[in-house]
Amino acid sequence: MQLTVKALQGRECSLQVPEDELVSTLKQLVSEKLNVPVRQQRLLFKGKALADGKRLSDYSIGPNSKLNLVVKPLEKVLLEEGEAQRLADSPPPQVWQLISKVLARHFSAADASRVLEQLQRDYERSLSRLTLDDIERLASRFLHPEVTETMEKGFSK
């Protein structure tokens, strides 16, 4: 049967699956199509969260049904899983906590949370897109700051 999975951010995909497919298998397919890690997915049908161990037929999900995908923030997933260590390429939790405090002063709790989540996604995306040239440029600036200063002075004249 054909299903449509729509993320809250607007992305969506169509999938062909058997009616008795496991929710966990569907999440794997969604992961491949929308590039959202399985552990960050929460699938909803008519407002009800789907459990990984159940089958689509257990929820009376039929052909041409539309499922909603909620992408859980990575930090929430890590807390739920009880993981103490953060990902190696993420800034220390203190940085996110500090940013969260600053955002809380300027936004409502819900808006601050959404802004922080988007900032974290943008940060991860930026890191994943760094090229070797970008890394070499950054390293040169850190290792030879005097060269960078000289270049900046030359441009400001």
Swiss-Prot record:
Major localization listed first in the record, in broad terms: cytoplasm
GO BP terms in the entry: post-translational protein targeting to endoplasmic reticulum membrane; protein modification process; regulation of protein stability; tail-anchored membrane protein insertion into ER membrane; ubiquitin-dependent protein catabolic process
Assembly description: Component of the BAG6/BAT3 complex, at least composed of BAG6, UBL4A and GET4/TRC35. Interacts with BAG6; the interaction is direct and required for UBL4A protein stability. Interacts with USP13; may be indirect via BAG6.
Keywords: Cytoplasm, Isopeptide bond, Nucleus, Phosphoprotein, Transport, Ubl conjugation
Region entry Required and sufficient for interaction with BAG6, spans: 96-138
CC annotations in GO: BAT3 complex; cytoplasm; cytosol; membrane; nucleoplasm; nucleus
UniProt-annotated location(s): Cytoplasm, Cytosol; Nucleus
Domain Ubiquitin-like: 1-76
Reported impact of L43A: Reduces tail-anchored proteins delivery
Modified residues (Phosphoserine): S90
Record GO terms (molecular function): protein-folding chaperone binding; ubiquitin-like protein transferase activity
Cross-link (Glycyl lysine isopeptide (Lys-Gly) (interchain with G-Cter in ubiquitin)): K48
One Pfam short name: ubiquitin
Entry keyword annotation includes Nucleotidyltransferase: no
PTM remark: Polyubiquitinated. Ubiquitination by AMFR and deubiquitination by USP13 may regulate the interaction between the BAG6/BAT3 complex and SGTA and therefore may regulate client proteins fate.
Effect of Y123E: No effect on interaction with BAG6
Known function: As part of a cytosolic protein quality control complex, the BAG6/BAT3 complex, maintains misfolded and hydrophobic patches-containing proteins in a soluble state and participates in their proper delivery to the endoplasmic reticulum or alternatively can promote their sorting to the proteasome where they undergo degradation. The BAG6/BAT3 complex is involved in the post-translational delivery of tail-anchored/type II transmembrane proteins to the endoplasmic reticulum membrane.
Tagged with keyword Transport: yes
PANTHER family: UBIQUITIN-LIKE PROTEIN 4A
Protein name: Ubiquitin-like protein 4A
Native organism: Homo sapiens (Human)
Annotated phenotype, changing V102 to E/K: No effect on interaction with BAG6
